[in-house]
C-alpha cells in the first residue's frame, strides 16, 4: 500500500526544488501524529519517512496542514509543525472527549474536540503564526514560528 504514486512523488519532489520562501503542504490525513489508530502517514512508515526526508533535505521552511480527525491539535517534530483542524460541521460528541484522551509525544498543547478551524498567518518573512480557533473565533491554541 502507498499514499502517493510514482507520478505524485515526482510532482511533489519537483515542487520542493522550486525557489520559494515557504511551503505549505496540505494532506487529508495527519503526517506527524503517531499514537492513534486512525488514518495517518505513520501507517505507511516508508512513505512517511520518504516525505520527512524530502522536507528535511529541501532546507526550506515547511508548514503541514491536515484534517479528517474531527478534532484540532498542533504537532511538532524538530522544527516542523503540523496544524490539524476539523471540523465545523461534524465535531465529536462531548461524552467521547471525556472517555477518549489521545496522547502523542509530538503534541504541542491540547487536543480540541469542539467545533474548530485553523488559521495560518504569514506575518512577514520571519514570523508564521498557527492558530486553532473555535466557532466563535476565539483562539484555542497558538504557536509563533520564527
Regions inferred by a protein language model and the residue ranges of each:
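Metal-dependent phosphoester/phosphodiester hydrolase catalytic core
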Residues: 1-146
Amino acid at each position: 500500500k502507498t499514499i502517493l504514486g510514482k507520478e505524485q512523488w515526482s510532482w511533489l519532489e519537483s515542487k520542493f526544488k522550486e525557489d520559494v520562501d515557504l511551503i505549505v503542504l496540505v494532506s487529508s490525513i495527519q503526517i506527524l501524529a503517531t499514537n492513534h489508530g486512525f488514518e495517518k502517514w505513520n501507517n505507511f512508515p516508508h512513505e512517511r519517512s520518504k516525505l520527512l526526508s524530502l522536507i528535511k533535505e529541501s532546507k526550506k521552511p515547511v508548514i503541514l496542514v491536515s484534517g479528517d480527525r474531527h478534532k484540532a491539535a498542533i504537532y511538532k517534530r524538530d522544527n516542523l509543525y503540523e496544524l490539524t483542524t476539523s471540523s465545523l460541521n461534524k465535531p465529536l460528541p462531548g461524552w467521547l472527549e471525556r472517555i477518549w484522551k489521545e496522547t502523542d509525544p509530538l503534541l504541542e498543547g491540547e487536543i480540541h474536540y469542539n467545533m474548530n478551524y485553523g488559521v495560518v498567518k504569514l506575518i512577514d518573512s520571519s514570523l508564521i503564526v498557527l492558530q486553532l480557533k473555535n466557532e466563535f473565533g476565539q483562539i484555542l491554541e497558538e504557536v509563533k514560528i520564527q
